[in-house]
Amino acid sequence: MKIVKISPRGYCYGVVDAMVIARNAALDKSLPRPIYILGMIVHNKHVTDAFEEDGIITLDGPSRLEILDKIDSGTVIFTAHGVSPEVKQRAKEKGLTTIDATCPDVTKTHDLIEAKKAEGYHVIYIGKKNHPEPEGAVGIAPDIVHLIEKADDLKTLEIPTDKILVTNQTTMSQWDVQHLMEDIQKKFPTAEFHKEICLATQVRQEAVAKQADVADLTIVVGDPKSNNSNRLAQVSQEIAGTTAYRVADVSEIQLEWLQGVENVAVTAGASTPTPITKEVIAFLDQYDPMNPATWDRIRKVPLQKILPRVKVKKEQ
């Protein structure tokens, strides 16, 4: 079996920065304990499990405000997905120490929404409902930001002004966003468009679109909650025309997927630890359908290998 290692794949700078911020927090003895992450720091359970070993508690729930209600003291880390001003204010009122690990690309969208609100605009925001990134973006100005996920959402959308900005969640499929923007332009011809697919998401999607078409199968390594990982599988199927499966790690690979497959493409979401992806590639590389000894799919990567290394500051 030939392995097509799609490149680029895996970690983006926003994810690495967020994890380094959280690791440094764990090492900072001056920070009030306990230390919480408000939601998953990035959408990967291997990462959150590794942070648990570092002594950082991940709390998840329907909304950031609801999670915050569970915390009475200590330090709170805001995830790469960003949070609303209301969440920041609530944390301040509760006397919590806060650390902001928001991805710079997400912050740029928040700043854009604030600027356009000041100019009297309404904002149509394309994103996934119940995902933390749209929650934070809508929370910047909930009175003028309208979240839509699909074309059907446009049917009932009414906006009381011609001053309309259209932007989007950074991890969406760029093709889905383009199609929705075309639909929006038909209904709201005066709308201004500001596509905010982050560069890391864009180049990873384009790599799948261009490189997966030579494969019989694509394996996307990523957490089920990772929107960008799920979009990579979608791009493989809809753009490259190659059947795709998303797996959290090697243990989720089904042998029947590999029957008759000569070329398998492998990519990974922006929040997927590199050792987890390497383990998937190593399994596929040694897999022999005629040799049961090669069929074991057991994740062996230790949690201490998941997180990026940080330099420990020497005490003066």
From Swiss-Prot:
How, per the record, is the cofactor bound?
Binds 1 [4Fe-4S] cluster per subunit.
Tell me which residues this entry annotates as catalytic: 133 (proton donor)
Please indicate if the UniProt record lists Oxidoreductase as a keyword: yes
Q: Does the entry feature the keyword Oxidoreductase, yes or no?
A: yes
What pathway is this protein a component of?
A: Isoprenoid biosynthesis; dimethylallyl diphosphate biosynthesis; dimethylallyl diphosphate from (2E)-4-hydroxy-3-methylbutenyl diphosphate: step 1/1; Isoprenoid biosynthesis; isopentenyl diphosphate biosynthesis via DXP pathway; isopentenyl diphosphate from 1-deoxy-D-xylulose 5-phosphate: step 6/6
GO MF terms held by the record: 4 iron, 4 sulfur cluster binding; 4-hydroxy-3-methylbut-2-enyl diphosphate reductase activity; metal ion binding
Residue positions annotated to bind [4Fe-4S] cluster are 12, 103, 198
Positions binding isopentenyl diphosphate in this chain are: 43, 81, 131, 226, 228, 271
Q: Which reaction does it catalyse?
A: isopentenyl diphosphate + 2 oxidized [2Fe-2S]-[ferredoxin] + H2O = (2E)-4-hydroxy-3-methylbut-2-enyl diphosphate + 2 reduced [2Fe-2S]-[ferredoxin] + 2 H(+); dimethylallyl diphosphate + 2 oxidized [2Fe-2S]-[ferredoxin] + H2O = (2E)-4-hydroxy-3-methylbut-2-enyl diphosphate + 2 reduced [2Fe-2S]-[ferredoxin] + 2 H(+)
Provide the GO biological process annotations: dimethylallyl diphosphate biosynthetic process; isopentenyl diphosphate biosynthetic process, methylerythritol 4-phosphate pathway; terpenoid biosynthetic process
Enumerate the InterPro entries for this protein: LytB/IspH
Q: Where does (2E)-4-hydroxy-3-methylbut-2-enyl diphosphate bind?
A: 43, 81, 131, 170, 226, 228, 271
Name its co-factor(s).
[4Fe-4S] cluster
Keyword vocabulary terms for this entry: 4Fe-4S, Iron, Iron-sulfur, Isoprene biosynthesis, Metal-binding, Oxidoreductase
Annotated EC:
1.17.7.4
Similarity section: Belongs to the IspH family.
**Reported function:** Catalyzes the conversion of 1-hydroxy-2-methyl-2-(E)-butenyl 4-diphosphate (HMBPP) into a mixture of isopentenyl diphosphate (IPP) and dimethylallyl diphosphate (DMAPP). Acts in the terminal step of the DOXP/MEP pathway for isoprenoid precursor biosynthesis.
Name of the protein in its database record: 4-hydroxy-3-methylbut-2-enyl diphosphate reductase
List the source organism.
Answer: Bacillus mycoides (strain KBAB4) (Bacillus weihenstephanensis)
Lineage here is: Bacteria, Bacillati, Bacillota, Bacilli, Bacillales
